[in-house]
């Protein structure tokens, strides 16, 4: 099988490429970079592109996809595109308009996957993180089961081929799975996952329910100071990963990506650097031994880079549970 198109079958029978290109960049990075990087990624062989309303780059990412379709490089059906519903649009009547807005920005007719980005709801409006005059976040109270029903309607309407969630814990997944009248299970749960935070328990739970775990921050994280502790260890400088990279004549990033593929995790690789974008496609060109895998398992320290603790407080904050 052509390595570039290795896919996993989702519980709704659609197929998702196991290696995805992450498009998030900190706000100071010019949006034009998202356009260039996404084009480079498609040229390098990436077929799974991950973005979100929150990233404020869907116009550029959509333009990149459409330009690679226009020049004959790919067809629309070759591309697996993911967008995400932000927390200010959890109210059921706001779900479809939010997706339609993403589609308008993208200039696409449908997304392949639409995710509930984060389980905490904030007040509706233009602001992605609405705050009161004292700088406190304005939370909203929304039943996520009602949000999910609106997501199901988006799938029925053909606006999203598949629907899933992101940053949900086991309890929140079970709440959806046990919902009376559930029409479609989430196809995936996209969460932070890397050798320092390997999500073993959540992965086992997801596998038992035929839900794919998709890894973000698989290479550590963007280390944006607003979100990430600058003193946290740099994953790709880990001596064990560096030693394995040397052994396999690969980069530490490729070791971290390959680790996920071999445990049945779909992995997102985020880079705006042309050389590294091309390099990350080499994840299909080598294999880790079971000893290597055990060694990497041993690096786990249950360390999250993205605690998103500005959202802590409401009962739906997902990271207080063990998993």
From Swiss-Prot:
InterPro entries: AKR, AKR1C, Aldo/ket_reductase_CS, NADP_OxRdtase_dom, NADP_OxRdtase_dom_sf. Pfam families: Aldo_ket_red. NADP(+) binds at residues 20-24, 50, 166-167, 190, 216-222, 270-280. It comes from the Eukaryota. The record marks 54 as: Important for substrate specificity. SUPFAM superfamilies: NAD(P)-linked oxidoreductase. It catalyses: a 3alpha-hydroxysteroid + NADP(+) = a 3-oxosteroid + NADPH + H(+); a 3alpha-hydroxysteroid + NAD(+) = a 3-oxosteroid + NADH + H(+); (17R,20S)-17,20-dihydroxypregn-4-en-3-one + NADP(+) = 17alpha-hydroxyprogesterone + NADPH + H(+); (17R,20S)-17,20-dihydroxypregn-4-en-3-one + NAD(+) = 17alpha-hydroxyprogesterone + NADH + H(+). It is found in: Cytoplasm, Cytosol. Pathway: Steroid metabolism. Its EC number is 1.1.1.-, 1.1.1.112, 1.1.1.209, 1.1.1.210. GO terms for biological process: bile acid metabolic process; digestion. Substrate binds at residues 24, 117, 222, 227. PROSITE patterns: ALDOKETO_REDUCTASE_1, ALDOKETO_REDUCTASE_2, ALDOKETO_REDUCTASE_3. GO terms for cellular component: cytosol. One of its GO terms (molecular function) is trans-1,2-dihydrobenzene-1,2-diol dehydrogenase activity. The active site is at residue 55. The record marks 84 as: Lowers pKa of active site Tyr. Monomer. Belongs to the aldo/keto reductase family. PANTHER family: ALDO/KETO REDUCTASE (PTHR11732). Cytosolic aldo-keto reductase that catalyzes the NADH and NADPH-dependent reduction of ketosteroids to hydroxysteroids. Most probably acts as a reductase in vivo since the oxidase activity measured in vitro is inhibited by physiological concentrations of NADPH. Displays a broad positional specificity acting on positions 3, 17 and 20 of steroids and regulates the metabolism of hormones like estrogens and androgens. May also reduce conjugated steroids such as 5alpha-dihydrotestosterone sulfate. Displays affinity for bile acids. This is Aldo-keto reductase family 1 member C1. The lineage of its organism: Eukaryota, Metazoa, Chordata, Craniata, Vertebrata.
